[in-house]
A protein has these predicted regions:
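Extracytoplasmic "Venus flytrap"
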Residues: 28, 33-50, 425
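Extracytoplasmic "Venus flytrap"/periplasmic binding protein-like
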Residues: 34, 53-132, 168, 294-295, ...
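Extracytoplasmic/periplasmic substrate-recognition and gating elements
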Residues: 32, 144, 164, 259-260, ...
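C-terminal capping/gating helix-and-loop segments adjacent to ligand/active sites or protein-protein/ligand interfaces
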Residues: 141, 286, 399-460
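Hinge/lid segment of periplasmic solute-binding proteins
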Residues: 19-28, 95-157, 208-211, 324-331, ...
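Glycine-centered hinge/linker elements that transmit conformational signals in sensory
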Residues: 190-199, 234-286, 326-328
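Short, polar/charged alpha-helical segment
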Residues: 21-24, 41-62, 159
């Protein structure tokens, strides 16, 4: 399947329904039980209690579930895949591993499976994929072939206290102080103004009421965790930069990457990030997405500017916890949110790839993604995200960020192919280095320029060691 297919016909309306149901699964010749690796939480509980029993009843194939934390999934599955003993039939992957696993031959292209097992062949899979966001399919593809079906979209949005932004007194004070209206930040400079403005000490007024505790402008995922890279990446992309640039030939085949020797946009992002930190909720080196969501939920901050929209339900608790609080969502400052998804794929050494294929399709149906949405997840299908009932105020607690996610995903449809972040088969090796460098650059005693010059050298080394195409220096203009 060509990657270009994943960029056609994009509008703000969903495509024609291309629905698959359990009833369409044909009789299976292979009844060997299969094993699914899935993340702990409500989604796996729903699969185990609702969907998998129906699948077994329909097909006669038993499904074993290995439920594990996301943090341990990569190592758990990679070790099994290296052994080639068919331990797992269906894998759960993070988008950053997708191309690496595909390049290693760990996962099977979906069209290859469709040709083998689907009565309608490739056309059935192409039709099945129509409702999915092209951005996510492009991220999960390798050599123009899709290997996985996404289910958990973690595209970013800016979660903010709408009640504070719309307060007349706060609006007047902000206008007087900064000379422009108080609205969700469209760039990191405006975000810095808002961070300063909303940071208050206990006893000061916030929306005409005295604070009983210190209040902060924003929450940053500034701990020594992977997520600080996602914030930095979003800022860098908004400045027109990248960690590495994919270069294509006239046939649109990837030939190599260019890595900036002195990454000016990364340096600017580091400076901007440091300016934000004094106005962020106090964070230790373990502070990440759960802590940031909690800071919003407990009324400690005005903005979580680089929030994962699949945590909207966590941020939204502020409306129950703080009288009068209302949560809003906008695009991230700069308009280039980090994006990706967790996805399911069939392993190369599956003992029953026929059943694994059909279960994969069943777990990605409208029914399944709708249930995922009702549980608080951020779905990957346009027809679910844009379902009319999710626009009702009664569904705001779970679906309040759906429209923002929809716009962000459409923005990234084919643009993800313009960034090395989403096109390198070595990103599983490179990503941890990005995270380490971003955390180091956030520390005030560190030399940002030196850190990112060293990082560029490391990126080249890792790409040239583990990647399929080389990386060379990109000379500064």
């Amino acid at each position: 399947m060509s990657l270009l297919l994943f960029g056609l016909g994009l509008t703000l309306t969903p495509p024609a329904l291309a629905e698959f149901s359990l009833a369409q699964i044909p009789p299976l010749s292979n009844k060997t039980p299969i094993t699914l690796v899935a993340e702990k939480g409500f989604w796996t509980d729903y699969l185990t209690q609702e969907m998998l029993p129906k699948f077994t009843e329909k097909t006669g194939v038993k499904v074993n579930v290995i439920s594990t934390e996301l943090e341990s999934m990569f190592e758990l599955q990679t070790q099994a895949l290296l052994m080639g003993e068919g331990k797992y039939d269906l894998l759960t992957m993070e988008a950053g591993w997708a191309k690496e696993w595909a390049a290693n031959g760990y996962t099977v292209p979906l069209l290859e499976l469709a040709k083998l097992y689907d009565p309608d062949g490739e056309k059935a899979m192409e039709s099945y994929l129509e409702p999915y966001y092209p951005s996510l399919l492009n991220i999960l593809s390798y050599n123009r072939e899709l290997h996985a079906i996404p289910y958990n979209n973690y595209v970013m949005g800016s979660h903010y206290r709408a009640d504070l932004f719309e307060n007349k007194t706060e609006q007047a004070h902000f206008q007087q102080r900064f000379g422009y209206p108080l609205k969700p930040a469209t760039n990191v400079e405006e975000l810095a103004d808002q961070a300063v403005f909303f940071t208050r000490k206990a006893g000061e007024l916030l929306a005409e009421k005295p604070l009983t505790h210190d209040f902060y402008g924003l929450a940053l995922m500034s701990g020594n965790k992977p997520h600080i890279n996602d914030e930095f990446s979003s800022i860098i992309w908004s400045l027109g930069g990248a960690w590495m640039w994919p270069i294509y030939n006239q046939q649109k085949k990837l030939t190599h990457f260019e890595v900036p020797t002195v990454n000016q946009e990364a340096i600017k992002a580091g400076i901007a990030y440091r300016k934000l930190m004094p106005y962020a909720y106090p964070a230790d080196d373990k502070f990440a997405f759960n802590e940031a969501a909690d800071a919003m939920a407990t009324g400690q901050v005005a903005i979580w500017p680089f929030a994962y929209n699949n945590l909207w339900h966590a941020s939204f608790k502020v409306e129950a916890n703080i009288p009068g609080a209302r949560l809003g969502v906008s695009q991230v400052p700069g308009g280039t949110p980090y994006n990706g998804a967790y996805a399911f794929a069939v392993s190369y050494d599956s003992k029953n790839p026929q059943a694994a294929y059909w279960l994969l399709k069943y777990m990605g149906t409208f029914e399944a993604q709708y249930a995922y949405a009702l549980g608080g997840g951020n779905p990957c299908r346009m027809d679910v995200v844009t379902a009319p009932e999710f626009k009702n105020a009664s569904k705001k607690a779970i679906a309040g960020a759906f429209e923002a996610s929809h716009v962000a995903n459409l923005f990234w449809s084919t643009k993800v192919l313009e960034l090395g972040h989403f096109t390198s088969t070595a990103m599983g090796q490179i990503y941890p280095e990005l995270s380490r460098a971003c955390y180091a650059a956030s520390q005030h005693e560190a030399n940002i320029t030196d850190i990112f010059i060293e990082l560029s050298t490391k990126i080249k080394q890792l790409q040239n060691t583990h990647g399929e195409v080389p990386a060379i220096d990109k000379k500064n203009k």
